[in-house]
Amino acid sequence: MNKGKIKQIIGSVMDISFESGNMPEIYNAVEIQTKVNGKDVTITAEVQQHIGDNTVRAISLQSTDGLKRGLEVTDTGIPISVPVGTKTLGRIFNVLGEAIDELGDLPKDVKKMPIHRNAPTYEEIKPKTEIFETGIKVIDLLAPYIKGGKTGLFGGAGVGKTVLIQELINNIAKQHGGFSVFAGVGERTREGNDLWNEMKESGVIDKTVLCFGQMNEPPGARLRVALSALTMAENFRDESGSDILLFVDNIFRFSQAGSEVSALLGRMPSAVGYQPTLSTEMGGLQERITSTTRGSITSVQAIYVPADDLTDPAPATAFTHLDATTVLSRAISEKGIYPAVDPLDSTSRIMNPQIVGEEHYSTAREVQRILQRYKDLQDIIAILGMDELSEDDKILVARARRLEKFLSQPFHVAEQFTGRPGKYVKLEDTIRSFKGIIEGKYDSLPEQAFYMVGSIDEVIEAAKQLKG
């Protein structure tokens, strides 16, 4: 193994000199043994640049506390490698693939894979576009996810992002028999801890791998943790041939960490202070999230929009890769309608009659038309009251209120809060139910019967109980 010495340390960036002809390759992991508070620790860094004079510039993936000039550095000869396979299920890892859940070390024979690899070739990519059924009515009908596609999840604090993510993990585990990988990129440690505890309570932890690079960690760790999680997901896809769900929360922090690393490496900043390699870094991550002939990775990415400016380079770069957007609205959550997905703001690339079929397309568009008209009439209703509306508009408003309530759904992972058993609604049942409502077949049923149910059959049953 090549040995080198630290020449300079600035924050989490270090320059390391090696002997001529024994230089480590770009992206190789290098290790430094040192003592911190009397304990032996190994600090890992990643080679980023060859700066001449037999010297490399590396970015540390851990705190550089305790490091000093002259310390010996070992080139591992390979990039950062993380454990993969079924032995990782139910565990929490850091960027280096070390278990951080205090449940003991992984077996010695666990397979490891490097986090840097090429995206699938054109021959390996599966070109067919299929709907990814989530069992959540509002998503499947109005902004369907794509198998092997990428969805952006927009939402503020407390509108239900985490619960929606948990329900998707639960549904894919039970209905599709697949695994989920969660990448916490620049996450609050408390949120990661809450998610782990909630997953244990709801019973989905055994089908999930969690990978965290927290807010308090150096930018190198936050930049690479998404790749660590993606590598685990790729192995599940390629080895088990199943549909994998990859959650990234938050993709903005990935770009933010890249910006910090870029500045530390001395690159000239680009627009709004972001790194000049922003598009390349985002593309390198996103292009690996895809369907191949062996299986698919479907990704749901939470996206923070700085100052609500959608033209900011970080979210704007992410948008170009998204196939669907799910917008969570505080106004809808205040009405007690969960999931609080905005039916008019959420979009999907496959909302096309040639892909989803004419019946699905026309039903979804009519639902949106009715809800949009109801939104337009809100001011008139608030000022003049319902009596001033035309007969057609009165019928439309009544129908819209039923649709709005019917877009709510009890979740399996929220059973302990709501007291209602969770519902998974198949796509054909969703289309049939909404088609019946927009055609006026259920105008006579009370509004309350449409709230927090699965398919239309449950509405009819609830209406009987309300009347009885």
Curated annotation (Swiss-Prot):
**GO cellular component terms given for this protein:** plasma membrane; proton-transporting ATP synthase complex
Q: Which superkingdom, per the lineage?
A: Bacteria
Q: Provide the assembly information.
A: F-type ATPases have 2 components, CF(1) - the catalytic core - and CF(0) - the membrane proton channel. CF(1) has five subunits: alpha(3), beta(3), gamma(1), delta(1), epsilon(1). CF(0) has three main subunits: a(1), b(2) and c(9-12). The alpha and beta chains form an alternating ring which encloses part of the gamma chain. CF(1) is attached to CF(0) by a central stalk formed by the gamma and epsilon chains, while a peripheral stalk is formed by the delta and b chains.
- Provide the gene name from the record: atpD
- PROSITE patterns per record: ATPASE_ALPHA_BETA
User: Under what name is this protein listed?
Assistant: ATP synthase subunit beta
Q: Which family does it belong to?
A: Belongs to the ATPase alpha/beta chains family.
The cross-references to HAMAP family, in alphabetical order and at most eight, read: ATP_synth_beta_bact (MF_01347)
Which terms in the Gene Ontology molecular function aspect does this entry carry?
ATP binding; ATP hydrolysis activity; proton-transporting ATP synthase activity, rotational mechanism
Q: How does it sit in the membrane?
A: Peripheral membrane protein
| UniProt keyword terms in alphabetical order | ATP synthesis, ATP-binding, Cell inner membrane, Cell membrane, CF(1), Hydrogen ion transport, Ion transport, Membrane, Nucleotide-binding, Translocase, Transport
